[in-house]
Amino acid sequence: MGIAAQPQPLTKKDSPMVVEYIRYSVPAERAGAFLEAYQRAGEHLRASPHCLRYEVSRGVEEPNHFIVRIEWDSEEGHLQGFRRSAEFRKFFELVKPFVSDIQEMKHYRVESAWGRP
């Protein structure tokens, strides 16, 4: 039996990648429109070379809570690259109706991670 792989800490010098978390509380009657907006807005995230991946997750216990997780190549790539692009303007137009539902929107740096292939 082999030894389980241990998470390896990452430091700023190892990777400038940042993860943006956006937490939403969306009223039930708007949840479908929210998911549709992000489905369409995802096209503009995918078009950006600064966006590495994204996901939209819905709360199991509280289905009106959503977390949008976006991995960016760097904080600068997000704020100076994507946010100044035509893709951002198209993206924001789609998600703008839900800005008032945001509870948190911040960048985080991964310090430790592990996963299975």
What are these regions (language model features)?
Residues G2-V18, E55-I67, F92-P117:
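Glycine-rich beta-strand-turn "strand-cap" elements at beta-sheet edges
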Residues V18-S25, E55-R83:
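Short, well-ordered beta-strand segments in beta-rich or mixed alpha/beta enzyme
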Residues R40-L52, E71-K106:
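An amphipathic, aromatic/His-enriched active-site/gating alpha helix that lines ligand/cofactor pockets
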